[in-house]
């Protein structure tokens, strides 16, 4: 990429603001910085179900599970969704930099993420309002067979705020279909209700919180740091959780809870 090529693509993207062509010009601009195999722009609104605004791909298999699985509830375990919930996130985030320490061991990673053939993913975050975040996620999948290199990641980070600003300006008037809906209850509360209705298992708020930490890929040490309690206390929470659910392993916890996730988004 030369400076003149980048400047030309940036000028094209600026001229395309507030037109339907912006996503394509945005894509061309990003490709000057880092070649990618797929791009998807997603709008997150609070804890409601997210909306896909744009997608492009080399191999369609990468988005085959998107509508049924990701939007059907798997997004609740996505590290990028968790970043959105932090609020006011701008700039570049690499998935593996924000994912929990045991992310690759999770049901989400093994049964959803690997199915997409994604090898690496970087997101441009743009905070539109207090509750709405846009992410432009660019990925490398089996089409290229390799992750982003150091030079590409450096280029993306260098222009991260420019890319965020383009997204924010273009979608500044974006209104989610959920804007008139009441905010859903916290996901821990929804999980407790679904588990009680489906299996007559009554978790305490803390047990539900720990269960979700485990599903997202947090180790016991990571959970202790997030909750501000000792590692031994987390181990006690896990034993209580497993006993109440009549299970003895993390795999059984995934098998019990993952089918409930579609129910958690019914009112999202």
Model feature map: region roles:
Residues 217-252:
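Recognition helix of helix-turn-helix DNA-binding domains
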Residues 181-206:
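Regulatory hinge/linker segments at domain boundaries
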Residues 167-185:
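Short alpha-helical interdomain "coupling" segment at the junction between an upstream regulatory sensor module
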Residues 208-209, 252:
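Pre-recognition alpha-helix immediately N-terminal to the DNA-recognition helix
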Residues 6-17, 24-132, 138-140, 150, ...:
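Regulatory input/activation interfaces that engage signals or partners
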Residues 1-5:
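Short, low-complexity N-terminal regulatory "tails/caps" that precede and couple sensory modules
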Residues 191-200, 239-268:
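Basic, Lys/Arg-enriched C-terminal extension of HTH/homeodomain DNA-binding domains
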Residues 214-218, 257:
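Short helix-to-turn junction characteristic of helix-turn-helix DNA-binding domains
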